[in-house]
């Protein structure tokens, strides 16, 4: 997509490809993989994940293994409304939520959530990296650069500007500690579950996090993995409710942007996912260290060629 992508400076060979959700993305990707004898592909964005998982069988027939579950599982987990609905039907506890079809339903659900006394959350059913996420509440700090709140009346004004009603999910606000959990599974059987406490985030990604032991979080994630039948790497995000229960609010059925933190903790989940994909064995158990991650920006300088 970008000729000056910073990642080009950290790899042996690079290509500019179409957007992950474009019609010819997978055909271009397959051609590149065959040309370079690539046998594993790692989707790193939702658009790429959906396109690649949809054509997974075609890749596999050519000896190219995508690190992801099948398309039906991927879509059901990625689409926030379907994900919450599916887990609720399987008796997995989830936050209170609603999939509104019009403005009037939003007003009704806001009252049920206890608004304006209690805030609630609104987000697109399909989006990544925190895009479109808002906390609906009456009071907010205007001078906070990370302010992601919106008043109900302003939310309604925004939605009324669209010709077609947006597909959104309304969800109860979870006030407790937040966890991003990287997991590795094999045909629905959890192999590794590594909770990481999200201490500080910038937009969607964590910039301060801590790999910790949390049995309640691990137990909930294990149930979710088995219910969906995830295969290989997945990331599951949870937050504690007011009743002190960790509840899932988002699932990324792919590697996460912060998977590197697990390597620092002693478990290289990305490497293990690749090994499983190509039929190699991985350690059944590896001790994990608690570790804190601080993320920062670094520059790459490109000198003009004379």
Please provide the spans of the model-predicted regions.
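ATP-binding N-terminal substructure of ATP-dependent carboxylate-amine bond-forming enzymes
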Residues: 1-68, 107
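Phosphate-binding site of ATP-dependent enzymes
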Residues: 146-206, 210-228, 239-247
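Short catalytic-loop micro-motif centered on adjacent basic/acidic residues
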Residues: 16, 40-43, 95-98, 169-171
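Active-site nucleotide/adenylate-binding loops and adjacent lid/helix of ATP-dependent enzymes
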Residues: 74-168
